[in-house]
Amino acid sequence: MSYLNLRLYQRNTQCLHIRKHRLAGFFVRLFVACAFAAQTPLSSAELYFNPRFLADDPQAVADLSRFENGQELPPGTYRVDIYLNNGYMATRDVTFNTGDSEQGIVPCLTRAQLASMGLNTASVSGMNLLADDACVPLTSMIHDATAHLDVGQQRLNLTIPQAFMSNRARGYIPPELWDPGINAGLLNYNFSGNSVQNRIGGNNHYAYLNLQSGLNIGAWRLRDNTSWSYNSSDRSSGSKNKWQHINTWLERDIIPLRSRLTLGDGYTQGDIFDGINFRGAQLASDDNMLPDSQRGFAPVIHGIARGTAQVTIKQNGYDIYNSTVPPGPFTINDIYAAGNSGDLQVTIKEADGSTQIFTVPYSSVPLLQREGHTRYSITAGEYRSGNAQQEKPRFFQSTLLHGLPAGWTIYGGTQLADRYRAFNFGIGKNMGALGALSVDMTQANSTLPDDSQHDGQSVRFLYNKSLNESGTNIQLVGYRYSTSGYFNFADTTYSRMNGYNIETQDGVIQVKPKFTDYYNLAYNKRGKLQLTVTQQLGRTSTLYLSGSHQTYWGTSNVDEQFQAGLNTAFEDINWTLSYSLTKNAWQKGRDQMLALNVNIPFSHWLRSDSKSQWRHASASYSMSHDLNGRMTNLAGVYGTLLEDNNLSYSVQTGYAGGGDGNSGSTGYATLNYRGGYGNANIGYSHSDDIKQLYYGVSGGVLAHANGVTLGQPLNDTVVLVKAPGAKDAKVENQTGVRTDWRGYAVLPYATEYRENRVALDTNTLADNVDLDNAVANVVPTRGAIVRAEFKARVGIKLLMTLTHNNKPLPFGAMVTSAVSYTHLTLP
């Protein structure tokens, strides 16, 4: 190294600040130079970068003076992840301008953008005087505020003293960022059918179709829910077709009130009074609008099927779920309930016609509210039920819950109708280590169908507790005691004192009533105990218990329901032992079932780096016993196929015998496909006497300004992916969801009032397609159809060698395009 260069670096007292990734190929020479410089007295000279470290020819190196001031990028617009005080805010395009010699480039953030991230603009002197589109000089207006761009991470780190931040809850998203979505129409369809060949009972055919349609205009959402059922039998003449209208409603959010307005068919909250369906109007709080840090249950249903069975779930007289399940234990955790409360009646219909029927209580956890938070509901309309034995009286209901200091909550409500008056008052308390408890009492005055008048009270206790030390989670302990004169509002809507909840027909009733349809107001409810507990056993085992016990006045008959199970794992081998018991008050005997399931993935025997398709397959064994001598054993394989693992299969075979049925071989095979245009399934099961073929298709149709897009079944809130030109691109973290031939896709669900990340997998793009950005973030309101737009560039990729005067471009040169649609990428 020359003496001149050495003297230059003796002047450069800041050489240690040169970023190592800029000069990675020359670190040896830099180390020597800095070592010599360390022996020389420090000076205050400005940073100087000697281009001879990069090339002997100075013309081979561009002007790098901007890097001498720590400016790693030229001014421009860059897409960055924004973090404020180490918390993620958003990913967006930010314009960076030239700052002073020490700052390099600085972000241009407007007052509204900073306010959306939680800055209290009123607390910063002079900030509210800036124009709406002006760049806020953040670091000069707020002492100790910083803004630093991490080029390598594409991350903009902002720090602002807490004194200048708004007092917002964690996870708060300003309402101005909520997206009400686009105007569009939607249709959900779910069709299922099965054909049963019974050597003794003949042939039977069943079909079920559920249609959920809707229309979004601005913030308004119109929805309709209708079902159709069909059945025919060789032993009866003709077939039976039945259309059933479930509900229609119009709703929208009222953002200033953090509430929701519903017109038409709806349901009351089941937190204070029993939930009921109505036709009328309701204004109620919507806690989904609150951030997660300020928020305080559809139940999970467990059951056991003896064979391939049809599971139907009813709530408030309506069929809300219908599916075919394989033999053995099953879990249903995706119920779309027709109401926010109301016990669920679960029917398991076996292929031989036998049924298991039990009721799953559906109620809320203790009603505690945060200090200062108020939740309310006001409803006016007429009572609505799918039971033909019930009338439609008009009623008014209001409820109110308010959080007080020290963990207390007070709540109450009223129900008013011509033949019914009820008033409720209760208190709740967060008792810290002792759990949470709520107690309330309802005073009711009722007039029954025989015009008899009754006064009564009902007292309810609810308790919730988690014992983290022992791994015990007491999810819900509830007890309700009612005096003999207490009736709820639904009891007064019956036209007779007793009967069956079935549809009336002209002439002789052809349907044989079931004991679960029977009601008798002379035997009103007395006491009800319900319990749900989960217990962690070690690191890999979980025990769960759930049950309820309902007694009645005037009879010793009781309703009983109990579920227990043990889930455990040894390495990657899982097994489950489960037990169920159900009994209706008017049923003789009990239905019981004991089951064992073992699952062993084939990856247990494969190398960790194996790419065999068997990595996505497992072997299984199941045994079920009804404790009356009937036992079924099944063994087989199940797994997934295709690149996206969106084709699942299961093949099982075994033996069933003992008890009341015949003995012989049994088994089933199923295929389920989840695709970009919808879902489909088909299955076949057999035993010695019965053969069954079942099938189904489901999906969603979205009609919008850009055309019609097909997809998987749509949830209440969905995302329309718009990426014209990017056909057949996979949507990340979604099974089977890809863009269609036009570049559109439907993300079938999204979380309302929360930021949802939508991303396209760039590895699935065509060779001639690029995306400016593969990630979009949306914050939909409830029921919205929001658009996530991606700009696709379709063209031909070129690899070019650029020269100037027949020489390579200087190191660090900037290359720009005079044509806006040309996209240049330089290494």
Task: Please describe what each predicted stretch is.
Residues F67-G70, Y83-L84, I173-L177, P299-T308, ...:
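Structural motif
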Residues Q162, G181-R199, W220-S232, L261-D265, ...:
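Transmembrane beta-strand segments that form the barrel wall of outer-membrane beta-barrel proteins
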Residues R235, G266-G275, D440-K525, S578-L596, ...:
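Outer-membrane beta-barrel translocator/channel fold
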Residues T822-L826:
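Conserved small/polar residues in nucleotide/adenosyl-binding loops
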